[in-house]
């Protein structure tokens, strides 16, 4: 019974500890990755709320074109900065203007 050697409490042999130490040293030498911290952006102010516009007119094509992207798709609220109420008015006005042939359905 004197041949039995005591294992460490965490059951990791000294050889395994050396391998783990080598691997951790290798990863730190290869290059430590930096954490990227993103600056939170302030919320955009709704264009229509700022001007005090309650309803969006479908005949005002210049204003509606600002809410379309290059493929003539309606821009989302995040990109345009519109509030929920005005985004719904804008999307309905764009749809009416498309039916009246004031705005294109697809890219030219």
Swiss-Prot record:
GO terms for molecular function: small ribosomal subunit rRNA binding; structural constituent of ribosome. Keywords: Ribonucleoprotein, Ribosomal protein, RNA-binding, rRNA-binding. Gene3D superfamilies: Ribosomal protein S18. One of its GO terms (cellular component) is cytosolic small ribosomal subunit. Pfam families: Ribosomal_S18. Residues 1-12 have a biased composition (Polar residues). One of its GO terms (biological process) is translation. Residues 1-33 are annotated as: Disordered. InterPro entries: Ribosomal_bS18 (IPR001648), Ribosomal_bS18_sf (IPR036870). Signal peptide: none annotated. Belongs to the bacterial ribosomal protein bS18 family. Binds as a heterodimer with protein bS6 to the central domain of the 16S rRNA, where it helps stabilize the platform of the 30S subunit. PANTHER family: 30S RIBOSOMAL PROTEIN S18 (PTHR13479), SMALL RIBOSOMAL SUBUNIT PROTEIN BS18M (PTHR13479:SF40). Part of the 30S ribosomal subunit. Forms a tight heterodimer with protein bS6. HAMAP family: Ribosomal_bS18. This is Small ribosomal subunit protein bS18. It comes from Mycoplasmoides gallisepticum (strain R(low / passage 15 / clone 2)).
């Amino acid at each position: 019974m004197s041949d039995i050697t005591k294992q460490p409490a965490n059951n990791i042999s000294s050889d395994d500890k050396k391998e783990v130490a080598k691997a951790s040293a290798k990863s730190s030498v290869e290059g430590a990755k930096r954490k990227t911290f993103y600056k939170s952006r302030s919320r955009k102010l709704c264009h229509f709320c700022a001007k005090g516009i309650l309803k969006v007119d479908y005949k005002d094509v210049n204003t509606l074109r600002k809410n379309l992207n290059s493929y003539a798709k309606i821009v989302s609220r995040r990109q345009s900065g519109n509030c929920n109420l005005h985004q719904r008015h804008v999307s309905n006005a764009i749809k009416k203007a498309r039916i009246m042939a004031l705005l294109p359905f697809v890219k030219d």
